[in-house]
């Protein structure tokens, strides 16, 4: 299930949602649509109510 944390952004660049991307970056760049596991693991992004 490693592919859930490593996803590609819309520009094709690899995006590590656990360490590199903020929660909003994870959603916008990596294509996550909710805080659940989608294209990447957004639940791993430290996301407060921002």
Swiss-Prot record:
Q: Where does Zn(2+) 1 bind?
A: 7, 15, 26, 30
Asked whether the keyword Cytoplasm is assigned, the reply is yes
Q: Which residues bind Zn(2+) 2?
A: 15, 17, 21, 32
A Pfam family matched by this chain, by name?
A: Metallothio_Euk
A Gene Ontology cellular component where this protein is annotated is: cytosol
**Record-linked InterPro entries:** Zym1-like
**What does this gene product do?**
Metallothionein involved in tolerance to zinc and cadmium. Binds four zinc ions.
State the protein's name.
Answer: Metallothionein zym1
- Species annotation: Schizosaccharomyces pombe (strain 972 / ATCC 24843)
**What gene name does this entry carry?**
zym1
